[in-house]
Amino acid sequence: MSENILIVHENKKARFDYTIVETYEAGLQLMGSEVKSLRNKDVQLKDSYISFKGDEAYLQNAHIAEYKASSYNNHVPERHRKLLMHRNELDEIFEALREKGYSCVPLKIYFKNGRAKLQIALVKGKKTHDKREAIKKRDVSDQIRSSLRRSR
């Protein structure tokens, strides 16, 4: 059976600011108007993160815009959204977060077979010099690509 995947939004800043240790897939507990806003790609994951309350994980600071065609029964754009994951995955992440230097951030939000999914990652923060190295490598590879195009 093939999987239909429609990427709604990617958190490019997270890939730049952090070193990704491991990724997980989580479902999202959403309201109807939030799903419609996601289908319109009205979402922002820039400063969002995953937090734990008790033994449950929540997506925080993710902005899903209000659905414009919705009536009075609309959602709050930056509410905390519960993540739906297996217990063993939650325990794995929770144990890693107890160690110093680890965080958990969302990488992308997408629809998989019609259901909203969130790819989250266990990450470690990058130092400033690591970010500079990444920029230099990207610039060098861009220059090489452009020179190869010109030489054809």
UniProtKB/Swiss-Prot annotation:
Q: Which residue windows are transmembrane per the record?
A: none
UniProt keyword terms in alphabetical order: Cytoplasm, RNA-binding
Report the locations given in the UniProt record.
Cytoplasm
Sorted alphabetically, which InterPro entries does this protein's record hold? SmpB (IPR023620), SsrA-bd_prot (IPR000037), SsrA-bd_prot_CS (IPR020081)
What GO molecular function annotations does the UniProt record carry, in alphabetical order? RNA binding
Give the UniProt record's GO annotations in the biological process aspect.
Answer: trans-translation
Q: What's this protein's family per the entry?
A: Belongs to the SmpB family.
Protein name (database record): SsrA-binding protein
Name the gene behind this protein. Answer: smpB
